[in-house]
Amino acid sequence: NLTQSEVRKIVKQLENARLIQKDNTKASNNAFGAFAGQKQVTVQLQQIYLDWQRQQIFRELSSRFMRLSSTQKNNMDRTVVMADNPASARYQESAKIDLRLQELDQAGISDESASLVKKLEELNKLLDPTNEPRPKLALEKVKAELDPALEGALTDIKGSRLQSAAGNERRARGAMI
């Protein structure tokens, strides 16, 4: 990280270069030292900025997954309500419409999740996993937990297996958090 003393040292070298105008060699040495110090500071500032950008990307992905988990929970709650309805009510036209809406909502959740996972994969390709393991670990969780749960929830909703769908939706929500 950039320290106050490094900045003070560079400023002092620049001031010395300006003050020692009679001795060109000393002035040049101070100016070159200050220039080299400025370059180091610039490189450090660029690194700090890149680290900040990376953290912003992580925060944005985390925030979007949290919002998506909330959407998944709402969808799960509606699935539970539908599953609790008497079997005879499931054959009514309104229940069929509700089931179709559940299916569309779940497909939308899966699509948005796929979009976020794609960004995570891009981030994983850019970063060295030994220095920044979070994208790789998140992708492992996606493959092991999220993808199967989302796929199972959608398949179960399409097959009118609402209790199983609710369980898969719960697992998907848990994997998003």
Q: What is the role of each PLM region?
A:
Residues N1-I177:
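Mature extracytoplasmic or organellar-lumen-exposed domains after removal of signal/transit peptides
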